[in-house]
């Protein structure tokens, strides 16, 4: 069986009072209503990282609007944003169907971007450090369930963490990211290419969804199946096939690193010994 996924590049920009701006929301909702039959055939609609730029838990109006949209298009919605709870501020991927069904909390945090390493020392170096609130990391490897398929989501730079990649055993992997901070720089293509390598490494389809970067459907050999251009709001429809098990790269890849390191050391020692 094949599963259909929608990668949505629009973001849910909101005012400070939690209301979604009509210009963006109106377009997004009209797109959903006008293509209701197409969305109904989808098994999930995925929005980019920070697609909701307010705390969903603290803004019930925003949460209700997302639930209403999911109900209107008859499709689960995977959105993301920062929420505050008993653990502090957390970066999360949230599945609506149409109510909140499952939540994944980002486990690998980006140094200086999401927390300040060695904070006590950093605060002595820069007075602005104290104004930065650390984000709290999650601990659970959430496996989302939609109809007869399962998938995992990694957020932004989590895709560079080998430990998290080794844990991917679901049918496909979703990457939600926000490249807006980097503007039109090589970083946009760099992160996409890392995702392509990861898709080949785990031999799975990988919907890659970015706010401003190159939103793409990536095949299990790292090939680009379809994509939309940078900075262009768009909805990308595609199909992904389910995969099972783990690859040799996931299972034994870590050992190759040690073999390469100690092998190189051994060759250097042998070379030095041969010169004597």
Go through each PLM region and give its residues.
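Enzyme catalytic cores with a strong preference for nitrogen-chemistry domains
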Residues: 1-276
């Amino acid at each position: 069986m094949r599963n259909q996924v929608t990668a949505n590049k629009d973001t849910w920009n909101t005012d400070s009072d939690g209301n979604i701006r009509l210009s963006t929301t109106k377009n997004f909702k009209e797109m959903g209503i006008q293509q209701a039959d197409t969305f109904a055939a989808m098994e999930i609609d995925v929005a980019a990282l920070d697609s909701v730029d307010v705390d969903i838990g603290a803004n019930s109006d925003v949460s209700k609007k997302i639930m209403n949209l999911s109900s209107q298009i008859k499709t689960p919605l995977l959105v993301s944003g920062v929420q505050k709870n008993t653990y502090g501020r957390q970066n999360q991927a949230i599945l609506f169907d149409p109510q909140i069904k499952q939540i994944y909390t980002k486990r690998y945090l980006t140094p200086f971007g999401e927390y300040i390493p060695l904070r006590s020392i950093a605060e002595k170096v820069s007075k602005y450090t104290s104004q930065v609130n650390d984000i709290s990391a999650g601990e659970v490897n959430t496996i989302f369930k939609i109809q007869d398929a399962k998938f995992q989501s990694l957020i932004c730079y989590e895709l560079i963490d080998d430990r998290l990649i080794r844990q991917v055993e679901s049918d496909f992997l979703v990457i939600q990211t926000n490249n807006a901070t980097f503007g039109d720089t090589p970083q946009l293509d760099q992160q996409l290419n890392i995702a392509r390598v990861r898709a080949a490494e785990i031999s799975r389809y990988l919907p890659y969804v970015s706010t401003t970067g190159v939103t793409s459907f990536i095949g299990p050999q790292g090939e680009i199946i379809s994509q939309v251009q940078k900075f262009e709001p768009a909805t990308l429809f595609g199909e992904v096939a389910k995969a099972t098990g783990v690859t040799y790269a996931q299972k034994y890849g870590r050992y190759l690193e040690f073999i390469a390191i100690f092998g190189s050391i051994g060759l250097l020692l042998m070379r030095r010994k041969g010169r004597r």
